[in-house]
Each structure stands twice: as C-alpha cells, then as structure tokens.
Amino acid sequence: MAAPAACTRFSDNYDIKEELGKGAFSIVKRCVQKSTGFEFAAKIINTKKLTARDFQKLEREARICRKLHHPNIVRLHDSIQEENYHYLVFDLVTGGELFEDIVAREFYSEADASHCIQQILESVNHCHQNGVVHRDLKPENLLLASKAKGAAVKLADFGLAIEVQGDHQAWFGFAGTPGYLSPEVLKKEPYGKSVDIWACGVILYILLVGYPPFWDEDQHRLYSQIKAGAYDYPSPEWDTVTPEAKNLINQMLTVNPNKRITAAEALKHPWICQRERVASVVHRQETVDCLKKFNARRKLKGAILTTMLATRNFSSRSMITKKGEGSQVKESTDSSSTTLEDDDIKEDKKGTVDRSTTVVSKEPEDIRILCPAKTYQQNIGNSQCSSARRQEIIKITEQLIEAINSGDFDGYTKICDPHLTAFEPEALGNLVEGIDFHKFYFENVLGKNCKAINTTILNPHVHLLGEEAACIAYVRLTQYIDKQGHAHTHQSEETRVWHKRDNKWQNVHFHRSASAKISGATTFDFIPQK
C-alpha cells in the first residue's frame, strides 16, 4: 500500500500576506514560508471558474516552470492543488519592470543595453535548451530581482509557453502580443524557438532608441510591416548607434526563421561578448526620453484595453510584476495591446472576427507599408500636440474664473462669446443667453469692493472635439473671507464648452451645478468689504 501523501495544503506551509494584484481568475499575494521565513509571490487560481482547456493551460504552465532553473528566470518553487484553488509559488521579485528602471537611471548607454539583452538572451537560451518556447517576450515580462543597482533581469510569465522537441517546427496556434509577433506566426506557418529571437530583436531595438521597429495604430498595417520585415534606422537617433548593434538586430529581425540567429549564437556576437571593446558608452538621453513616452503609452493602452477586453485566457494575464514599491504582479499591457492566444479568436461562418473578446483581425492582402519609426514619432507628436491643447483649455478656463473673481467684466467679455448660453443656479433652471445677465453680478457684487478670493479647479477633464472645439468638466472650490473675518468655502461642478475663433478660444456654453455650501452663498454672491 502506498504511503500517505505528505501534507501539501498551502495554508499549512505558507502564511498569506497582502495582495499584490489580480487577474481574471487569479490573485497574487505575498506569502511567507513557515519553515524558512522566506518570502514568495503566490499566484492563487480559482479553479471553480476554469474550463477544461484552462486546466490544461495551468498544468502546462506549472510543468514548464518546474523545468526552468536559471538566475534570469522567475522561478516556480511550489505548485499546490486544493479543492477549489491552485497555488503557484514564485520568486518574489521586487525591482519592477526593466524598462521602468532604465528611465529612472542617471546614466544609460549602448553598453547598458548590451548587458540587458545579454541577460534576456541567457534566459531565452536556457528555455530553448530545455525545449521551451516562451512565445510572449515583451517589456512587461522583463523584471528586476530587486531595487539594488545591477539587479538581475528576470524573465516572467510562462502562461503562453509551449514545449517543443529540438528544432521541430509546427503550427502551435496564434499566440503572443501583436507588436512582438514574428512573421511566421502572422503568416500562420510552422514555427519554433526562433519566434523568441524575433521578439528579442524588437526589444533590443527599443532598448537602443526608445521606440519599436514596427508600429501602427492600425493593426492591419502593423502586421503587414512585420511580415515584410519593414523597419529602418532613421536619423538622427540611429546615427550614434554602432554598426555592430545594428548587425545583431538585423540577424534577429530576419524574416526567414531558418536564417535567423539563435540565442546561443547571439550570445557569441561581438556586441554582446565583447561589449567593453565594441559597444558605445556614451549616455543616450534621447533614448531615455523616448522610452519614458513609450512606457507611458503602453501603460495607457493597457489600461484602456484591460477595461475593454475580457478574454477567456487567464494564464497570460496574471503573474508577477510591479505593484507599488516592493512587490509585483503582472497584468498584460503593451503599446500594441493585449496578449493573445488562438483560443481568443472566434470566427463566424464568413471568416470575420468576433471583436467582442479580442482585438485580433484579419490581415488584408494589399496594404501600403509606412515607415513605422516615423509613424510612431509622428503619433507621439500628435499626442504632445493634444496635450498642449488640453493645457490651453485649462489655462483659458482659469483666466475666465480669475476675471470673475476680480470683477473684470471687460476681461470676461473678451473670453466669452457674445451669445454665450448657460444653465446656472442664479437663473433658476432657465437657459440664459448672452452676457447681460452676468453683467448685473459684475456691477453689483463682483466690483471693486469685493474681498480677495481664491478659486481652485479640481480634477479637470478636457475632451477635444476636433481642432477648434473642446469641453472641460471640473469641480470648482471657491474660498473667501467675509467682513467679520470668517472663512467661507463652497463648491460647484462646472462644464464649459470652448470654440476657437480667429485663433482665440471663446466660452460658448457652460453648465454649473447648485453650490454645495460649506458656508457662504452662491458663486456670484460674495460679501463686500466695509
């Protein structure tokens, strides 16, 4: 008779601590091993919500992670199955994302990029030596072991990883993150370990200049760029990158997977193994600046898509990355959006894609290929322009409120359209048109005898409505001192519509809520001095 199984219940071996983050069917918590006091990150999966296919993915992820023991890979220490929950106990990595750390550094050079990609290639090479293809290499899965200077880079999230025999290639399904997908995956051809090298090439390109080699807001055009291998090295940012670095990128971003460099070969490339002699050590401030924008963009895209997409694939959405200062959880985000697997793609009888669960779409055959680097930079420029216009709207709104506070009717009329419309408490629910209604308050309440007041705009939200119109919504807090020296504050919620005429912004409509009086009267009813 077999010996009884050892006690493996999670709570018997670990103390659960605070939550680090959560995914669709899982939650990540810090835990402490009772016997040693060591800290780990426990990925806790609610198995009641899983399908049979999800169970297979979970078992595959655990099986693969158990095979991998390398200083540059987030290690799985324990896998515990209970009645309704499965626990995966990983390294607790506390250094955050590699890309976020780079932008916080005082110095960053080509040699630093070489050291980063070397560690990534070491992890990939270990995977490939053990018959594992990661399939989802991207910045979000590159973490740092700790906050210490020179901390090791750790490859995380094996939710999409597969097992292969040797150099065998087959169609293992459509999986990965759009901006990092290889041509063979997009062409739905047999593939293998070389898909990871392609993704490493994309990552190295970003490490050197701060933006990706393939990029387009339209996913159709993005996929066409990738399948054609349409990338370049635009001036001036690439002029200062050594030829050896470009040579390695070219060998990684080779469209033919059979001619693509392997991880072992890449580690022997002069730019990697002889970096002290080959790689430049000049600080790359423009790369850092561009990488900050790249990081912000992918985080924003990820946040938006996380709210839009509820895919069935749980395992690629929740592992270990940053959450606060000392702990990590992983949510899939990227400038090219969400991690995808073929299970997520539902086609109807006509072959069109069900967009209710995924952003993947069919690729048209004839699409004009644009220079991705220039397109990316142009879009960043457009984003900066939009940001500048939002600041314009906030500033002109502040100027209008200042005119009200100071009783400057002339200044008020210059900012407002003559046919300004408004819903406001003073009009008792009626729509007021023109500024004569407001003139009464300027002449009788907001005149020269009005005490100094202070107004604060809270949480301004600006919606740009084309090039010449915008709407701003905000909370307005007004403070003033009455003639007895008592402080008063009241709050109102306001929305203003602005229109640009003759290159000047004018307020054409506003809506103000009734004041929430902490004390005091209405927005226009300020108590004059003696």
From Swiss-Prot:
The modification Phosphoserine is found at residue 327. Expressed at a high level in the central nervous system during the late embryonic stage. In adults, expression is more abundant in the head than in the body. Residues 320-358 are annotated as: Disordered. Residues 291-301 are annotated as: Calmodulin-binding. CDD domains: STKc_CaMKII (cd14086). Changing residue 307 to S: Fails to interact with CASK, catalytically active and can autophosphorylate. GO terms for cellular component: axon; cytoplasm; dendrite; neuron projection; postsynaptic density; postsynaptic membrane; presynaptic active zone. Transmembrane segments: none annotated. Changing residue 306 to D: Fails to interact with CASK, kinase inactive. The modification Phosphothreonine is found at residues 287, 306-307. GO terms for biological process: cellular response to starvation; chemical synaptic transmission; courtship behavior; learning or memory; long-term memory; male courtship behavior; negative regulation of apoptotic signaling pathway; negative regulation of cytokine production. GO terms for molecular function: ATP binding; calcium/calmodulin-dependent protein kinase activity; calmodulin binding; protein serine kinase activity; protein serine/threonine kinase activity. Its EC number is 2.7.11.17. Interacts with CASK. PANTHER family: SERINE/THREONINE-PROTEIN KINASE. This is Calcium/calmodulin-dependent protein kinase type II alpha chain. It comes from Drosophila melanogaster (Fruit fly). The lineage of its organism: Eukaryota, Metazoa, Ecdysozoa, Arthropoda, Hexapoda.
